[in-house]
């Protein structure tokens, strides 16, 4: 039983110690307990425990069910060919539920899906079968670098948030941060077509105010991300919209534009998908 709980549980203290043993030793107990409450550790572990018989795509679907979260999907053109190999790219407005919905929906239409994620999410062990970890704050481990490359060379469908972090309030509008060009480079290298998507939704005003304050104070650590689990639980009973645009052939990503220029063009197509559905 203890072994099973270890597999299922998210443990903030263990995560901190895994990333920085020195920090874990220096943090007062009341700070660790505060972080546990802030990220809803007990509620997350209850969700995982209640669904202990599921993992990967099935678990994502069960979590959405338990949170009473629904979604509608709108296509603007042709649907991806079930026999194709794709990189599905999307804006990242929520920081949690948007990923769960993409895993559930794309995973229900394709046999094998992989999601490129922050390596911290690997601590959610039951979702690890669909996660491919990247280190956003340092060098990637050699085995993770190999897994990253092997994933693009495989037949699995790939889910990707090119911004890396969830959306922020920019010039009064909720919008993604700069998209990184990696997905364009990997699409060309691995001969994968790209499917642009737009996901509706936003976080609370407090989340964006804290992000703005943190930036004004010159704090580099994205402390607002600690609020993302709370943002997820706040959205119980919510419904979202996912807009899916026409697949973009990798053969069309020619030298007339740089990879970064293609990245920005595809970002525009992603945001435009919400206005072009049939």
Could you say what each language-model-derived stretch is?
Residues 1-89, 99-101, 110, 128:
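Membrane-anchoring hydrophobic helices of lipid-metabolizing enzymes
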Residues 2, 12, 145-278:
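Non-catalytic C-terminal accessory region of glycerolipid acyltransferases
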Residues 41-43, 86-140:
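Catalytic core of membrane glycerolipid acyltransferases/transacylases, capturing the structured
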Residues 57, 142-145:
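Structural motif corresponding to alpha-helix initiation and N-cap regions
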Residues 61-65, 124-125, 233-236:
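Short, conserved catalytic or adaptor-binding loops enriched in Gly and charged residues
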Residues 63-69, 134-140, 172-173:
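Short, flexible loop segments at the rims of nucleotide/cofactor-binding pockets, characterized by
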Residues 67-74, 140-142, 224-226:
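Short gly/ser/thr-rich secondary-structure transition/capping motifs
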Residues 74-76, 116-118, 134-135, 245-247:
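Conserved beta-strand termini and adjacent loop/short-helix elements that scaffold enzyme active sites
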């Amino acid at each position: 039983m203890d072994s099973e709980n270890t597999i299922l549980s998210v443990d903030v203290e263990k995560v901190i110690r895994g990333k920085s043993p020195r920090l874990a030793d220096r943090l007062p107990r009341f700070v660790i307990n505060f972080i546990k409450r802030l990220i809803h550790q007990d509620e997350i572990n209850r969700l995982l425990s209640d669904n202990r018989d599921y993992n990967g795509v099935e678990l994502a679907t069960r979590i959405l069910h338990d949170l009473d979260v629904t979604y509608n999907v709108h296509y603007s053109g042709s649907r991806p060919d079930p026999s194709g190999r794709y990189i599905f790219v999307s804006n990242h407005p929520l920081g949690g539920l948007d990923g769960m919905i993409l895993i559930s929906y794309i995973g229900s239409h394709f046999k094998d899906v992989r999601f490129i994620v922050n390596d911290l999410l690997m601590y959610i062990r039951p979702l690890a079968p669909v996660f491919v970890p990247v280190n956003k704050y340092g060098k990637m481990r050699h085995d993770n670098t190999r897994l990253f490359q092997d994933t693009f060379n495989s037949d699995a469908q790939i889910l990707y948030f090119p911004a890396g972090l969830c959306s922020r309030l920019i010039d009064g509008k909720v919008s993604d941060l700069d998209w990184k060009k990696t997905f364009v480079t990997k699409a060309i290298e691995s001969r994968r077509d790209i499917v642009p998507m737009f996901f509706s939704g936003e976080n609370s005003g407090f989340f964006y105010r804290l992000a703005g304050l943190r930036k004004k104070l010159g704090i580099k650590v994205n402390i607002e991300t600690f609020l993302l689990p709370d943002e997820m639980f706040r959205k119980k009973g919510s419904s979202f919209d996912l807009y899916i645009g026409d697949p973009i052939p990798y053969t069309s990503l020619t030298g007339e534009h740089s990879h970064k220029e293609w990245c920005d063009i595809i970002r525009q197509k992603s945001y435009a998908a919400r206005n072009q559905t049939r």
